[in-house]
Amino acid sequence: MHQKILILDFGSQVTQLIARRIREAHVFCEVHPCDVTDDWVRAYARDGKLKGVILSGSHASVYEETTDKAPPAVFELGVPVLGICYGMQTMAHQLGGIVTSGHQREFGPADVRAHGHTALLEGIQDYKTAAGHGMLQVWMSHGDKVTELPHGFKLMASTDSCPIAGMADETRRFYGVQFHPEVTHTKRGAAILERFVLDICGARADWIMGDYISEAVEQIRAQVGTDEVILGLSGGVDSSVAAALIHRAIGEQLTCVFVDHGLLRLNEGDLVMEMFVGKLHAKVIRVDAADQFLGQLAGVSDPEAKRKIIGREFVEVFKAEAAKLKSDQSRHVAWLAQGTIYPDVIESGGAKNKKAVVIKSHHNVGGLPELLGLKLLEPLRELFKDEVRELGVALGLPYHMVYRHPFPGPGLGVRILGEVKKDYADLLRRADAIFIDELHNFIDEASGKSWYDLTSQAFAVFLPVKSVGVMGDGRTYDYVVALRAVQTSDFMTADWAELPYALLKKVSSRIINEVRGINRVTYDVSSKPPATIEWE
């Protein structure tokens, strides 16, 4: 059994990034809600495998009576504790310090000065000042701040606007940082978390994906037993890896249902069948439901409404297919499997403690009501995208499948702004295919990689507005598409990709000349945050 780090989640949108960074250090960790009891904490630590505790951030204020605090037992276990942002504030508040509302909110990049040569920050820095002070470039997101240290703590870090940006009680191995080491904007954040879990906690670096496969296979077999499972197969990375993992566990007990809702990428239906039936030898039922989906989406322009309609129609299709399978007396279909991953859960406010603020609903999480009559199997629910890809490779899936850019469950339905129409989808399919084709074709000289491999996600978006153009001697009045390409390591934050002008020029020229009905191409230069990766 692995040694473990316990992460208590107070509802931050980026809590799961803490888990991701720790797993990158090959240390096993689990996320649990912050409102667990003292008895639960003591029982969790009873096997001697608990090596440390991390308290996450939150949008709440610790001095309000109704907000959650850490279970007091956390500070009595004798293991190291790290508080991040709100986690530091609740540590200070509960141990006798003072937390107050700041006069100004600190959100964004900041330069933090390290103090006191603590075990957590010793030797970790981005640069030194002329006076020789070690400085860290970090990401802040807070309004409240610690104004008085608890007894036994010393100052560990500060900024100009936050005099106590870090604190340490090295005797008890309690540490707090006001900034977020888990996000990529904190350049040395991974090193800080590695220092905590490996050096201060002394946890073994023995968490590898091969271990996850064996444990997940065992868990799936125990969950499912002799029941049969159906899985909604989209051809994307998540559902593909989920299918391969479940197939590894239960083989012929898995039936994949591939729904062609009329909102897939160009030729995707045929490619999915070739890949899964021809190469993986899985059982796949293909359902042509384009008319059903497009009919229900007619006249609907609200993004949330579209997502919910698509989710609802998936339920109807699955109910119909499940009924067919259940009618066979020799089979017992009891489970619906999904390729839900951590970012889906987080952005839907569906983290384990249900305290995260909802940004937008996700197709995988919110589209399946209990009336489906099937239990939910989500073997990738605790994994981030990079871990899912690593798992896919370990399962023997082809590289091009595993490293294909993610595609949303609602498909082009959330890449067509406003009302979804078949003509719009046909135009967008062709424009998107050209964009992806040229990303594969253009090679970056410095790295030797294609721009498809250098971007994390790229796609075209259909804008239901027309602009005036000129083709030959004639005037055109046609639609506009926007190109979107981002670079990210975790999909929680993302930067827009600085594609070469020559590439953008080629893509624009091809789309305008080859896709009749489009006469203008734009490029989206928004990062996440404040924008999301998808437009809807």
From Swiss-Prot:
GMPS ATP-PPase domain: residues covered: 207-404
Keyword Ligase (UniProt): yes
Entry keywords, A to Z: ATP-binding, Glutamine amidotransferase, GMP biosynthesis, Ligase, Nucleotide-binding, Purine biosynthesis
Pfam families registered for this protein in UniProt: GATase, GMP_synt_C, NAD_synthase
CDD domains given in the database record: GATase1_GMP_Synthase, GMP_synthase_C
Molecular function, one GO term: GMP synthase activity
SUPFAM superfamilies tied to this protein: Adenine nucleotide alpha hydrolases-like, Class I glutamine amidotransferase-like, GMP synthetase C-terminal dimerisation domain
Coiled coil: none
EC number(s) on file: 6.3.5.2
Catalytic activities: XMP + L-glutamine + ATP + H2O = GMP + L-glutamate + AMP + diphosphate + 2 H(+)
This protein's GO CC annotations: cytosol
Pathway it works in: Purine metabolism; GMP biosynthesis; GMP from XMP (L-Gln route): step 1/1
Enzyme class: ligase
Lineage top rank: taxon: Bacteria
Residues annotated as binding ATP: 234-240
All residue ranges annotated as the Glutamine amidotransferase type-1 domain in the record: 4-206
Disulfide cysteine pairs (residue numbers): none
Active site (catalytic residues): 85, 180, 182
Entries under InterPro entries matching the protein: Class_I_gatase-like (IPR029062), GATASE (IPR017926), GMP_synth_C (IPR001674), GMP_synth_GATase (IPR004739), GMP_synthase (IPR022955), GMPS_ATP_PPase_dom (IPR025777), NAD/GMP_synthase (IPR022310), Rossmann-like_a/b/a_fold (IPR014729)
Subunit text: Homodimer.
NCBIfam families, A to Z: guaA_Cterm, guaA_Nterm, PRK00074.1
Physiological role: Catalyzes the synthesis of GMP from XMP.
Name of the protein this chain belongs to: GMP synthase [glutamine-hydrolyzing]
Species of origin: Albidiferax ferrireducens (strain ATCC BAA-621 / DSM 15236 / T118) (Rhodoferax ferrireducens)
Origin organism lineage: Bacteria, Pseudomonadati, Pseudomonadota, Betaproteobacteria, Burkholderiales
This protein's encoding gene: guaA
